[in-house]
Amino acid sequence: MRTSDFKFQLPKKLISRYPNLKRSECRLLVFDRLTTKITHHFFSDLPEILNPGDLLIFNDTRVIPARLYGYSVTGKKVEILIERILNDYQAVAHIYSSELVQLGEKFILGSNLNIYIYVIKIYYSYKLFKIYFDNINYNNVLSLLNDIGHIPIPPYFHRLDEIIDYELYQTVYGSKLGSIAAPTAGLHFDTLLINRLLNLGIEISFITLHIGSATFQPVRVTLIEHHVMHDEYIEVSQSTIESILRCKERKNRVIAVGTTVVKALETAAMNTKSLSIIESFSGYSRIFIFPGYRFKIVDSLITNFHLPESTLIMLVAAFAGYRNILRVYNAAIDLNYKFLSYGDSMFITCRSE
C-alpha cells in the first residue's frame, strides 16, 4: 500500500488545542466491524457499552517534563527535547537550534542555573544527540527535569505548555515515568469512570510502553512496507498475560486502550503460535502494524482520531479494515468530531454484542 492511501483532509477547526476539563465528557464513536454499524455516544456511556468480564488493558506510562530551553555559548536560543534518559547524567535528545549542532558543543540551561550540557555523540541517521549534564545540582537528570522541564505537548497544538497540561496531558493511572507523549486514548478515563467499570465487573490490567517523539512523525516513504519504525520500550507482565488468557477462556473481549497497548500485546505474541504459551515480555520493539496484519490478542480497541499518513491511522486501519476506517473518519469529520491528542474517541469492536 502507498502512504498516500492514508491521506485525507483534516480541517484545522477539528484539532483540539486544549483538553476537556472533565475527561469523560468527550464524544465516543462506536464502530462494529462485523455489522459495519456506526453509533454515537459520550465517553461516559462506556460502562453501558462494555460487558461484565471484558478486560481493559491500559498503558501505565507517565509523561516526563522532557522539554528544556537554553542558550548556546554564542547566545542563540536552543530547545532540547529529551528522548531517552540513559543514566543519572546522560540522555539522548533532539536539539533544535538556528545553528548546526557540533560534537563537543556546550549549551547553558536557563539564565541563572549554570547547568551545562555537552554534546558527546551525534546519531546522524536519527538526528539525535547524546548529551552529558555537567555542574548539575540535582541527584539525576530526572530530578532536574521535574524541576525545570516543560511538559512536551504535541507540536500541532501550536502553543507553549500551560498549567492545565501538567494535569490533563497525563492519565489518572500513569505511574511509570518515561514517555515524552501521552497515551492519549487513556486521557478520557477519570477515577469515577474507572470505579464504575470495576463495579460492573469489567476487569483492568496494565502494560508499559514509553512513547517517543517519533509518534508525531509522518511516514515519509512512498510504500508503507518500506517504513522503519523507531524503538519503543515495552513491558508486558505475566499477571497481564494471565488476565488475557482468563478473559479469552470466558469468551470476553480483550480491549486495548490505545495503539500503544496494541503494539505491546502484539509484540508479546509475535513469536508464538498459540495464545496458551505467551510469556511476559520486556525489551524494545519496532513492530509496525498496517493493513494485512493478523491480530493475535486484541479483540477491541479504544483510540483517538489520528493524523493523515501516520503509523497510527495505519494500525487502526489494520484493525478496523482499510475501507471501513475511511468511512468512519469521513463520518467523524462530517459530524465535527475532534481529532488528535485532546480530541474525541472511538471504540472499534470486532464482535457484535
From Swiss-Prot:
Pathway(s) per entry: tRNA modification; tRNA-queuosine biosynthesis
Highest taxon of source: Bacteria
Catalytic activity annotation: 7-aminomethyl-7-carbaguanosine(34) in tRNA + S-adenosyl-L-methionine = epoxyqueuosine(34) in tRNA + adenine + L-methionine + 2 H(+)
GO MF, one annotated term: S-adenosylmethionine:tRNA ribosyltransferase-isomerase activity
Chief localization: cytoplasm
SUPFAM superfamilies membership: QueA-like
Documented EC number(s): 2.4.99.17
CC annotations in GO: cytoplasm
Enzyme class: transferase
Gene Ontology terms describing biological process: queuosine biosynthetic process; tRNA wobble guanine modification
The keyword Cytoplasm is annotated on this UniProt entry: yes
Matches recorded under Pfam families: Queuosine_synth
Keyword S-adenosyl-L-methionine in annotation: yes
Self-association state and partner proteins as the record states: Monomer.
HAMAP family in alphabetical order: QueA (MF_00113)
Family of the protein in this entry: Belongs to the QueA family.
Described purpose of this protein according to its UniProt entry: Transfers and isomerizes the ribose moiety from AdoMet to the 7-aminomethyl group of 7-deazaguanine (preQ1-tRNA) to give epoxyqueuosine (oQ-tRNA).
Protein name (Swiss-Prot/TrEMBL): S-adenosylmethionine:tRNA ribosyltransferase-isomerase
Organism this protein belongs to: Blochmanniella floridana
Name of the encoding gene: queA
